[in-house]
Design a protein with these regions (language model features):
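Class I S-adenosyl-L-methionine-dependent methyltransferase catalytic core
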Residues: 1-110
Length: 110
């Protein structure tokens, strides 16, 4: 079942940090909702999440992205089973948002 954002976050209160691997199609909404309930967020997302003018305007132009932790090896994700990278492996990263941070993010390779 595909969950809507409200079904996942309706009962979320205030936290210091959120660590999540959100559904890609709702990732922007998770970040925006995360700013309402936590100071810091770490989200495992495709590296391509950093692309796009609309996402830049709504998220990245606010300067709250503190760090980008880029996996040096591509990752294959299939139903929680770790596998050898294949041709359809994807570039992933951890994005670290901090709503009190204002500035340019630092890049890290992991």
């Amino acid at each position: 079942k595909d969950l809507e954002l409200d079904e996942v976050t309706y009962n979320v209160k205030n936290y210091d940090v959120i660590v999540t691997n959100p559904p890609y199609k709702l990732a922007k909404e998770f970040v925006l909702r995360g700013f309402e309930v936590a100071r810091e967020q770490y989200l495992l997302l495709r590296l391509s999440f950093l692309e796009g003018q609309k996402r830049y305007q709504e998220l990245f132009s606010k300067k709250h992205l503190k760090g980008v932790y880029i996996f040096t090896a591509r990752i294959t994700c299939s139903e929680g089973i770790e596998e050898t990278p294949t041709a359809n492996s994807v570039a992933y990263c951890w994005l670290h948002f901090d709503k009190e941070f204002v500035g340019q993010p630092t890049l890290y390779w992991i």
